[in-house]
Amino acid sequence: LCIGDIVGRPGRRVVAEALKRLVQEHQIDCVIANAENAAGGSGLTPQIHEKLMKYGVNLVTLGDHTFRKREIIGTLEASETIARPANLSERAAGRGWRRRPGPGGSRSPGGRF
């Protein structure tokens, strides 16, 4: 499941209230969400990133507001569950791609996302 732009508290509330049910009902293996506007409508904080993971998001993508909240830089460097835009400089914090084990495990065909 790919979730478009999660915007502010209203967007986070919808994810918190509906995501786990959707994942169960539709047997979804992976949830990727764009969260570049999840913190007050612009940017992402480490705390909100952690909440999204608890709600059932597997991977967060970011966009042009990646660095709007400077406190996300440590999370970009440390977490395997967040990807910044790939077209930024290689010197920018974080990575523009992520490879994660999927439901079939890392050795099975298609077992990564």
Whereabouts are the PLM-identified features?
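Acidic, metal/ion-coordinating pockets
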Residues: 1-113
